[in-house]
Amino acid sequence: MAKNTQRTMPVLPLRDVVVFPYMVMPLFVGRAKSINALEEAMNDDKQILLVSQREADLEEPTPEDLFDVGTIANIIQLLKLPDDTVKVLVEGQNRAKINSLEDGEKCFSAQITPIETTYGDEKELVVAKSAVLSEFENYLTLNKKVPTDILNALQRIDDVDRLADTMAAHLPVSIRHKQNALELANVQERLEYLLGMMESEADILQVEKRIRGRVKKQMEKSQRNYYLNEQIKAIRKEMDGGENEDTIDEVEQLHQKVEAAGMPADVRDKVENELQKLKMMSAMSSEATVIRSYIEWMIQVPWHQRSKVKKDIVKAQQVLDTDHYGLDRVKERILEYLAVQARLNKVKGPILCLVGPPGVGKTSLGQSIANATGRKYVRMALGGVRDEAEIRGHRKTYIGALPGKLIQKMAKVGVKNPLFLLDEIDKMASDMRGDPASALLEVLDPEQNTTFNDHYLEVDYDLSDVMFVATSNSMNIPGPLLDRMEVIRLSGYTEDEKLNIAMRHLLAKQIERNGLKKGELTVEESAILDIIRYYTREAGVRGLEREISKICRKAVKNLLVNPKLKSITVNSDNLHDYLGVKRFEFGKADTQNRIGEVTGLAWTEVGGDLLTIETASVVGKGKLSFTGSLGDVMKESIQAAMTVVRARADKLGINAEFHEKRDIHIHVPDGATPKDGPSAGIAMCTALISCLTGNPVRADVAMTGEISLRGKVLPIGGLKEKLLAAHRGGIKTVLIPKENVKDLEEIPENVKQNLAIHAVETIDEVLGFALENPPEGIEFVKVEAKPKAPRRKVTSKSERAVN
């Protein structure tokens, strides 16, 4: 093939390197198009066009970003590496002019014309060769970066074309200068260009040497740390009027960013020292990479940037009310907190910790607080975190070291005063790598977090402007950490609250997400109420939202399958067509008064429920047994109730010997569900008295309260959930401990209006409300045992013989 024949071949763009003919060079290739170009070349004639990029930092270059002249190279060896990159060994052959360059889907391809080398006058070539070698030798004495053995290798090259290309390849000059040498097909012109370039570089090196000496003499010992900066200034002063560089070097760029970052004086001194180290290092050294990464992190961390905080409490209340239905006490406490912060213009104060079951809006409440105050929002999930370095970071001496997640999040959000949500703070763990909860102590203590020290940064960072809010599902938080936070409890939503949330927010949200138009789907309140009661059992509304989403999906399918159907209405009658059979049944009050059967009230993580307690008495020897997956505390409560009954047996008219002649069995149905706690004490005691007196218990009465050995009714927890369960189950009268009257303020008005709530102090008051009649004892009939026939003595043969 003639050298001037046009041909098409794949193109490999190069960054920071120019490959000359006669050069053998390894290349590391990682870009997909470049790898495709190599594969195409390997499948053809193993030749590829190597072209340098005009800008080395371009990841995806266009045809305009490549030079017009490249080098045709043979692929000697190609090796695929484990990280999906490719190492290829190439040998330059000859120059080529790009006539047209196409950016294909797989790779670049170019239509090229090989460039024929010309030599010029032979005598002038000899003179130029001698001058170039002489100047190169002089250049080596000034620039110690070029190995001296290259001169010996160049002197052994007879071919002037190869000599010029080899010398150009080894000169430490810019890519632009090397590309200019590559584009010169005439050898004489190329040698003259190299000669001029080396003379210019030698002049600069001479000036640099002279300046360095002069600056060194002028500096005192106290100024030695600034030696390199003075050197650069002197060089620029000497070069005034010359050709300016197109770009500022990397160190100077970092220096400008450090100045703009607004760091405190001590932090800036630390970073300046690191910059000085970086200037004296080779850019390719591993330590330079570590220092560069450290400085970039220090620049990214916000030192003075702040977002403007809103102080309009009325507007904040509107935002909270719009985003969350109910939660009045929680929102009131948050507004109090924001009001104090607005008045003091500081964030210092208690760290809020929102504690409640899943799905009640803890995380979204944190987002709403950020919206209400105008702060940027950043969230850090602590679930499963067990390494202290996740909070404090790794020391930068470790390979791959990074700041802790706290500093990383601050760098990402870009301001000093965001709302920082520590999500699932109770899910942290600890192991041999440290205890992240202990690391958080410094973060959450207002007296200490002004000087938070990340192991990677190695300087103090002020976190006092950050508004921290934590969330947790339980109080299972280390004591010292809990002591630094103010707990705000979010109980489960009431039935009315769930209904309102579904009708106002969830339904519209799911209709939009599932592509339904306005009017195509109507879900009545009765259907939502049935979903809450029979298809979900939760404290929050996540399950409720999933069920509504299921209805929307089925509605979309039905509308597409039946084009004549224009709209769908879902109510309690046809709900099972969309959600299937009912999954749950909530407790309902019995309609008949029964002996030994009492309705108690239970608290669960998903709300309250009715708890039926059954008692039976049979002839026996005074054995007390209990079944129904009862916990230790509940078993002890039964024993306490039995002692109360025995102590009051005479007063209640119960045969004092019942505990010797009767077996008592207490059973709590739904035996597969574990039950525990002391709050069923008065219910257990009432059931025992009803059983032993034959006096029925009113079916419309439910009760909750712990019993003491002296018959006093002690306070309990979860009153709100228990009263909601009683209201839902059709109970008319509820007995609660007198000490829990203060908790009635939290109960919705509609619930209190529909329940007759009586506060009781003793078991006597409980019996007055719960029993159908005043308690009277039962005379247990003594069962006479039939006389047994005398046992006949059996004698052995030997005994008979004796007698």
Curated annotation (Swiss-Prot):
Keyword annotations of the record: ATP-binding, Cytoplasm, Hydrolase, Nucleotide-binding, Protease, Serine protease, Stress response
Residue positions binding ATP: G356, P357, P358, G359, V360, G361, K362, T363
Annotated Gene Ontology cellular component terms: cytoplasm
Keyword Nucleotide-binding: yes
Ranges where the Lon proteolytic domain occurs: 592-773
UniProt xrefs under NCBIfam families: lon (TIGR00763), PRK10787.1 (NF008053)
Protein name (Swiss-Prot/TrEMBL): Lon protease
GO MF: ATP binding; ATP hydrolysis activity; ATP-dependent peptidase activity; sequence-specific DNA binding; serine-type endopeptidase activity
Family (UniProt): Belongs to the peptidase S16 family.
EC code: 3.4.21.53
Residues in Lon N-terminal domain copies: 9-202
Induction (record text): By heat shock.
Disulfide bridge map: none
Pfam entry (one): AAA
Active site residues of this protein: S679, K722
InterPro entries: AAA+_ATPase, ATPase_AAA_core, Lon_bac, Lon_bac/euk-typ, Lon_lid, Lon_proteolytic, Lon_Prtase, Lon_prtase_N
Catalytically driven reaction(s): Hydrolysis of proteins in presence of ATP
Subcellular location: Cytoplasm
Quaternary structure note: Homohexamer. Organized in a ring with a central cavity.
First-listed, main subcellular location of the protein, grouped into a coarse class: cytoplasm
Gene Ontology biological process terms, A to Z: cellular response to heat; protein quality control for misfolded or incompletely synthesized proteins
PANTHER family: ATP DEPENDENT LON PROTEASE FAMILY MEMBER
